[in-house]
Swiss-Prot record:
The lineage of its organism: Bacteria, Pseudomonadati, Pseudomonadota, Gammaproteobacteria, Thiotrichales. NCBIfam families: PRK04208.1. The active site is at residues 167, 286. This is Ribulose bisphosphate carboxylase large chain 1. RuBisCO catalyzes two reactions: the carboxylation of D-ribulose 1,5-bisphosphate, the primary event in carbon dioxide fixation, as well as the oxidative fragmentation of the pentose substrate. Both reactions occur simultaneously and in competition at the same active site. Can replace the endogenous type I ccbL gene in H.neapolitanus, constituting an active RuBisCO, however the active enzyme is not targeted to carboxysomes. The modification N6-carboxylysine is found at residue 193. It catalyses: 2 (2R)-3-phosphoglycerate + 2 H(+) = D-ribulose 1,5-bisphosphate + CO2 + H2O; D-ribulose 1,5-bisphosphate + O2 = 2-phosphoglycolate + (2R)-3-phosphoglycerate + 2 H(+). It comes from Hydrogenovibrio crunogenus (strain DSM 25203 / XCL-2). Induction: Induced by growth in high levels of dissolved inorganic carbon and low NH(3) levels (at protein level). Binds 1 Mg(2+) ion per subunit. Its EC number is 4.1.1.39.
Length: 472
């Protein structure tokens, strides 16, 4: 018997609300935090999100008969209350894997956070988490190299790596910029970094910066006997220009380059990650613009989703927040997305905001980068929070040392090694941090001065985007 077509508008929940559905291992699962307009039932708005982010539109169309909608449609299968928030609820939606292009984070994001976020029936909508099925994960390139390969390339083991963002971030000439890089690296840092908005400006063109920074790396390596690097920002206005900068960085022998993955876009990021994998370059990822997307607790995309998307798109480092510094970051939530960067399998853990199990299989991990308003007094907490597989990046906390960049770098290196040694001896580094640093400073005048300089500096502001479990 032929299918019949009934024109007109019908409620979304007639087709897309399926509370009896059992998600498959191959399904994408998404958790949206939703605030509907007044009078719109929860089931209807959950079904509307499922429809508008998959196969549905505002009216029935005859071409629905030309495909198997029951297979391809998104399914709203569960609704939950949000702790401490009577206005919002969680809508859980399952999507068949065939809705998304293989290996394309762009395809996934276009569907899940596309037009649906402008839907009039929604007052607010936030994508809290995605479960990427392992079958899909295996189609993505992931990090160009990963944590272990980076350690082997840089010949650094048993401790976090140390970095520094060169300041002032804008205005220096290429030669003065390179001098600042050299002083930091010879003082004891492993890496220095372009800030996110350092690209190719009239005061410092990219090619000049690359050359002076590479000279600084080679000179510092010769003096210290350690491998060094500087994150050369290849973010550009066009993909062609981005690849030209990456190619030049490879030619001069730099070990690591950088990309602003949100402003640059996932297409550019995945392409650059593929280039780095083929050409032996490490890739540092900055998250500039994330606060626009993830900070509002009711609308946007949670950073844990952006973290997963970056791991699939490709990057060896990713800025993760610090918990203790100047930037936004709830401790438990931060620990959750650090696990999502590094671990192979991350179980559901609502206490950290992780809504689904996530299996990355054999995909390499991403090194979290703690950066933003940190100094030597934060070192015990940073070592405790981030562990060894991380980069602790001090900008002003290096360059602001009264004795100069090299002294600031030396202070950070001494503080780091003292904390790592104390941890390895079984001490509770966070609780005993003051004593650990004070003892280390007896043998390091650079550390002593740094501790005196920043002893009163704190960033004690309440977190805006708290975990929902903390609102109870």
């Amino acid at each position: 018997m032929a299918k019949t077509y009934n024109a007109g508008v019908k409620e979304y929940r007639e087709t897309y609300w399926m509370p009896e559905y059992e998600p498959k291992d191959s399904d994408f699962l998404a958790c949206f935090k939703v605030i509907p307009q007044d009078g719109v039932p929860r089931e209807e708005i959950a079904a509307a999100v499922a429809a508008e982010s998959s196969t549905g539109t505002w009216t029935t169309v005859w071409t629905d008969l030309l495909t198997d909608l029951d297979y391809y449609k998104g399914r709203a299968y569960k609704i939950e209350d949000v702790p401490g928030d009577d206005a919002a609820f969680y809508a859980f939606i399952a999507y068949p894997i065939d809705l998304f292009e293989e290996g394309s984070v762009v395809s996934v994001m276009t569907s899940l956070v596309g037009n649906v976020f402008g839907f009039k029936a929604l007052r607010a909508c936030r994508l809290e988490d995605i479960r990427f099925p392992l079958a899909y994960v295996m189609t993505c390139g992931g990090p160009p190299h990963g944590i272990q390969v980076e350690r082997d390339k840089m010949d650094k083991y048993g401790r976090p790596m140390l970095g520094c963002t060169i300041k002032p971030k804008l205005g220096l000439s290429a030669k003065n910029y390179g001098r600042a890089v050299y002083e930091c690296l010879r003082g004891g840092l492993d890496f220095t970094k372009d800030d996110e908005n350092v690209t190719s400006q009239p005061f410092m063109r990219w090619r000049d910066r690359f050359l002076f920074c590479q000279d600084a790396i080679e000179k510092a390596q010769a003096e210290t006997g350690e491998r060094k690097g500087h994150y050369l920002n290849c973010t550009a206005g066009t993909p062609e220009e981005m690849y030209e900068r990456a190619e030049f960085a490879k030619e001069i022998g730099t070990p690591i380059i950088m990309h602003d993955y949100l402003t640059g876009g996932f297409t550019a990021n995945t392409g650059l990650a593929n280039y780095c994998r083929k050409n032996g370059l490490l890739l540092h990822i900055h998250r500039a613009m994330h606060g626009v997307i993830d900070r509002n607790p009711h609308h946007g995309i949670h950073f844990r989703v952006l973290t997963k998307a970056l791991r699939l798109s490709g990057g060896d480092h990713l800025h993760s927040g610090t918990v203790v510094g100047k930037l936004e970051g709830d401790r438990e939530a931060t620990l959750g997305w650090i696990d999502l960067m590094r671990d192979s399998f991350i179980p559901e853990d609502r206490s950290r905001g992780i809504m689904f199990d996530q299996d990355f299989g054999a995909m390499p991990g991403v090194m979290p980068v703690a950066s933003g308003g940190i100094h030597v007094w934060h070192m015990p907490a940073l070592v405790s929070i981030f562990g060894d597989d991380s980069v602790l990046q001090f900008g002003g906390g290096t360059l602001g040392h009264p004795w100069g960049n090299a002294a600031g770098a030396a202070a950070n290196r001494v503080a780091l090694e003292a904390c790592v040694q104390a941890r390895n001896e079984g001490k509770e580094v966070e609780k005993e941090g003051k004593e650990i640093l004070t003892n280390a400073a007896k043998h390091s005048p650079e550390l002593k001065i740094a501790m005196e300089t920043w002893k009163e500096i704190k960033f004690e502001f309440d977190t805006v985007d708290k975990l929902d479990v903390k609102h109870k």
